């Protein structure tokens, strides 16, 4: 049976001191919780936050990684460096990287494989933009991103893969995906993975929802059959908004 995976992506928020304080509060609040939890602070706070999380049930995540292994790549951070800081999970292909920084499926796949080959876990983000949603292309776009993101990934590594569905059109636009709409896309993602890897791997795959999950809608979303957790942005920046989501299931 799939467990729930509740993850917070802090994006470019929090000073190091603020990140440490929030991490300490979350460790206290989530201690003994029945699910998998993760927080992904900025690179600058990874070391300090990692020390807070050590020995807790909250995993340390990174928001991105270089596709390169090592060497002369100014401004890049390698998976080896992340692993050295105690990072356990890496977010790859977030919509803000795809559409804000021009990352394409080929680069995202390189990052996915780099993370998995290192033995770390990866969260592969997929999702359609507003114009793609309005054109009825959701399944086509998301399916293409899943297939491309997992290209050449061995089935034996799939236990370290989580997929996060981000309907970009539902983030900061005033539009929302209903639980049923989100679940239908999650079911499609699972069917694509079933075609690629077979039923056992597809049924075991954790698929998070990343479309503005909040305490107010978390319970309804997480009650859906194919929604196995959340990749949470704004609501993860305060314990008062993140903990209720984590406790909603």
From Swiss-Prot:
Which GO cellular component does the record give, naming just one? cytosol
Which InterPro entries does the UniProt record give? Aldolase_TIM (IPR013785), TIM_sf (IPR035990), TrioseP_Isoase_bac/euk (IPR022896), Triosephosphate_isomerase (IPR000652), Triosephosphate_isomerase_AS (IPR020861)
The EC number(s) given in the record are 5.3.1.1
- In which pathway does this enzyme or protein participate? Carbohydrate biosynthesis; gluconeogenesis; Carbohydrate degradation; glycolysis; D-glyceraldehyde 3-phosphate from glycerone phosphate: step 1/1
Q: What does this protein do?
A: Involved in the gluconeogenesis. Catalyzes stereospecifically the conversion of dihydroxyacetone phosphate (DHAP) to D-glyceraldehyde-3-phosphate (G3P).
Q: From what superkingdom does this record's organism come?
A: Bacteria
Task: Write out the annotated subcellular location.
Answer: Cytoplasm
Active-site residues annotated for this sequence: 94, 166
- Identify this protein by name: Triosephosphate isomerase
Subunit? Homodimer.
Q: What is its main location?
A: cytoplasm
What organism does this protein naturally occur in?
A: Treponema pallidum (strain Nichols)
Q: What is the reaction catalyzed?
A: D-glyceraldehyde 3-phosphate = dihydroxyacetone phosphate
């Amino acid at each position: 049976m799939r467990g729930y995976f509740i993850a917070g992506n802090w994006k470019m928020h929090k000073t190091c001191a603020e990140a440490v304080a929030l991490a300490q509060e979350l460790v206290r609040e989530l201690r003994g919780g029945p699910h998998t939890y993760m927080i992904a602070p900025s690179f600058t706070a990874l070391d300090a936050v990692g020390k807070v999380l050590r020995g807790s049930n909250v995993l340390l995540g990174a928001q991105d990684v270089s596709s390169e292994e090592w060497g002369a790549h100014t401004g890049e951070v390698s998976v080896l460096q992340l692993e050295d800081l105690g990072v356990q999970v890496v977010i790859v292909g977030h919509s803000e990287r795809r559409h804000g920084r021009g990352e394409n499926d080929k680069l995202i796949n390189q990052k996915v494989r780099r993370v998995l080959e290192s033995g770390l876990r990866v969260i592969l983000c997929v999702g359609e933009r507003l114009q793609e949603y309005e054109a009825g292309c959701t399944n086509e776009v998301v399916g293409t991103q899943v297939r491309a993101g997992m290209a050449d990934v061995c089935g034996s590594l799939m236990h370290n893969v989580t997929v996060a569905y981000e309907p970009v059109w539902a983030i900061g636009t005033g539009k929302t995906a209903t639980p049923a709409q989100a679940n239908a896309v999650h079911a499609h993602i699972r069917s694509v993975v079933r075609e690629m890897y077979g039923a056992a791997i597809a049924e075991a795959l954790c698929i998070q929802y990343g479309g503005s999950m909040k305490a107010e809608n978390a319970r309804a979303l997480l009650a859906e059959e194919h929604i196995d957790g959340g990749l949470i942005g704004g609501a993860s920046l305060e314990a008062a908004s993140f903990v209720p989501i984590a406790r909603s299931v």
